[in-house]
């Protein structure tokens, strides 16, 4: 990314309820000076779809939070996708139960699963090879 300070800055803000989290997310991005244009860049929102549970169970990433983040990045020109690979059920089943699938449908962004890993080989580094989900590349 163009902003070198991005990896060095963190903003922690409180929101009394998910319905109003978009404003806090925007404030947080301003606090870390995330002002990059994302025009045409791919952004994968990696959610936590631990199981096929509704948002009220607080098991998965809340769909209101996912919607807010996705909308902000879409407005900045990003090509957003949302994904995960739950261990207990399929991504589609967990996303439907959690409300994440509705967010994807409403915003026209793809829901991707991480069930198709591809090998990655590096010349240098601690790990010379590993597998990563195809949508992450």
Language-model regions, residue ranges each:
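N-terminal and secondary-structure boundary signal
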Residues: 1-137
């Amino acid at each position: 990314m163009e902003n070198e300070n991005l990896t060095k800055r963190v903003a922690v803000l409180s929101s009394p309820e998910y319905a109003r989290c978009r404003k806090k997310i925007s404030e947080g991005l301003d606090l870390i000076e995330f002002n990059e244009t994302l025009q045409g860049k791919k952004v994968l929102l990696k959610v936590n779809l631990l199981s096929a549970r509704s948002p009220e169970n607080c098991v998965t990433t809340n769909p209101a939070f996912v919607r807010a983040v996705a909308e902000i990045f879409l407005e900045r020109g990003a090509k957003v996708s949302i994904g995960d690979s739950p261990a207990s059920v399929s991504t589609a089943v967990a996303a439907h139960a959690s409300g994440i699938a509705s967010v994807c449908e409403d915003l026209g962004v793809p829901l991707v699963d991480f069930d198709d890993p591809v090998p990655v080989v590096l010349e240098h580094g601690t790990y010379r090879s590993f597998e990563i989900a195809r949508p992450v590349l």
